[in-house]
Regions:
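Short, aromatic/His-centered strand-loop micro-motif at the edge of beta-sheets
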Residues: 180-213
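Terminus-proximal functional modules
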Residues: 1-51
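Beta-rich globular "head" domains
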Residues: 28-30, 126-140, 287-440, 449-457
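Short, solvent-exposed beta-strand-to-loop segments that form ligand-recognition rims
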Residues: 202, 232-255
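Edge beta-strands of jelly-roll/beta-sandwich modules across compartments, strongly enriched
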Residues: 41, 272-279, 444-455
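Low-complexity, Ser/Thr/Pro/Gly-rich disordered linker/stalk regions
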Residues: 49-174, 190-192, 244-324, 396, ...
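C-terminal interaction-tip segments
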Residues: 145-166, 234-237, 430-432, 438-458
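Localized edge beta-strand/strand-to-loop motifs within extracellular or lumenal beta-rich domains
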Residues: 209-225, 231-233
Length: 458
């Protein structure tokens, strides 16, 4: 017998109509919740609801879902794969392509050892005490022997995802680097062992060759609950609950700040190409959210000479590769910047470079604030290339006091701006860079300097 059923309610039935609801709940069925005039029922043969763990009408902390969720990240592929938002990593004949008609990204691989990984640059900030929700739409496609497909909220060290393994078996997985030995451990639960709904029969029988909407919500606090399932006909169907308090002796996951990701990995040469599609995804915080980062700033200690008609990277910041022996998975947002010039008018650009290699530096990068920051800075760069201009404008020379710096303080794009952040690359070896550039628009030299104020979020 199916572990769940959905009953269409007559229009005259109200949620508080206990007599009617008790009647349809007889004979081994328990009401979980009502949504859009449908009663979502669970078989009592599979166990009873405990502390709301099966009730999708409450969040991961058991709070009634009445608040508007705060979107931490949202990802679509309507106009292609945006390199400002995604990291693509391939090996062998692994391939990643955009399907403009499907508004999706396709991954494929054929040969042994090949892989294709499509991952957000953003490691989304988890706020303790808030329920975090991830939704991802996809088509895994038919299983291909020797190929593993994954989609969810994860990286190489930690995360939660749906997996189709080399034999075609489906499972929910929690990956963790909490052992402290450098090894990765994984809780893996096959579909036949999902403890709420296996989706193996009944009205909603999971067909992974069709479009699906994967659902995750979790408490972290290092010891909380994780729920996995799917959204079907507007109803969130919880399939498996991982409980960790009073069970594990260590945190279930080392880092809750993670990217959305999908991947294909081949362990053998496959007879046919293995493929999947990733369509759309979002990460949300429930019950309120404040991006409570740590604020730092740097400035040029001395003026730099900007010659006539030239451009100069006045000041730059980037993320360190390693923090306390771990990959640096913080992200940084500029809050404001200032540019000053003493003699001539200049144009300024706040630019985001995709790699440190795009900046020619005259000396080593320096750690900010005696290593309490996850950022390092440079004030001696001489050239730059490529980059995305986030902000631009002009600074006029001070006509009253020529030798007095004339600052222009400019507010920066806010939290909702998808491009106003820098992050590390896939393996935390080459950070994106914020660089403040001055361009001399006149026929005479001038002295320039700059400052940056930013937030570090992790």
């Amino acid at each position: 017998m199916s572990q769940h059923k959905i009953v269409k309610l007559p229009n005259w039935v109200l949620p508080e109509d206990e007599n009617y609801l008790n009647e349809i709940g007889k004979d081994g069925w328990e009401l979980i919740h009502i949504y859009n005039q449908h009663a979502y029922m669970k078989s009592t043969a599979a166990g009873t609801i405990s502390s709301g763990s099966l009730n999708a009408a409450v969040d991961a902390f058991g709070r009634q879902r009445v608040s508007e969720p705060f979107t931490l990240g949202d990802y679509k592929h309507i106009f292609g794969i945006e390199d400002q938002l995604f990291i693509n990593k391939v090996n062998g004949d692994g391939d990643i392509t955009n399907n403009i008609n499907h508004s999706s990204t396709g991954l494929s691989a054929t040969s042994s050892g090949s892989y294709a990984i499509h991952q957000s640059k953003m490691y989304h900030h988890y706020m303790p005490g808030k329920s975090q929700v991830i939704l991802a739409s996809f088509v895994l496609g038919a299983a291909v022997s020797g190929s593993t497909k994954r989609i969810g909220y994860f990286d190489d060290h930690n995360g939660i995802f749906l997996e189709q393994d080399t034999t075609g078996s489906l499972q929910f997985v929690i990956r963790s680097a909490t052992s402290g030995t450098g090894s990765i451990t994984e809780q893996r639960v096959k579909q036949s062992n999902w403890n709420v709904n296996t989706l193996s029969n009944g009205e909603f029988t999971l067909d992974i060759t069709k479009t699906q909407l994967f659902y995750i919500d979790f408490q972290w606090l290092a010891v909380g609950r994780v729920r996995c399932g799917f959204v079907h006909k507007g109803i969130t169907v919880i399939c498996h609950v991982f409980d960790h308090t009073n069970v594990l002796s260590v945190p279930y996951m080392q880092n809750p700040n993670l990217p959305v990701r999908c991947e294909i990995r081949n362990s053998v040469n496959t007879i046919i190409p293995s493929s999947m599609e990733q369509i759309c995804s979002t990460v949300m915080s429930e019950g309120g959210y404040t991006e409570s980062g740590k604020a730092y700033s740097v400035t040029n200690e001395t003026f730099r000479v900007l010659t006539s008609g030239s451009s100069l990277p006045v000041l730059a910041i980037r993320l360190k590769n390693i923090v306390n022996g771990m990959p640096n998975r913080a992200f940084v947002r500029i809050q404001n910047s200032s540019v000053f010039t003493d003699q001539q008018s200049v144009r300024y650009l706040l630019t985001k470079l995709p790699s440190g290699s795009m900046l020619t530096t005259g000396s080593a990068w320096l750690s900010v604030d005696n290593d309490t920051s996850v950022v390092e800075y440079n004030t001696s760069a001489t050239a730059y290339s490529d980059g995305k201009v986030l902000l631009s404008g002009f600074v006029g020379a001070n006509s009253l006091n020529i030798n007095q710096a004339n600052p222009l303080v400019q507010s920066q794009p806010g939290v909702t701006n998808k491009q106003n952040f820098i992050a590390q690359n896939y393996d935390s070896t080459d950070s994106e860079v914020y660089v403040l550039i001055a361009k001399n628009m006149t026929a005479n030299n001038t002295n320039v300097g700059g400052s940056m104020l930013w937030s570090e979020i992790y």
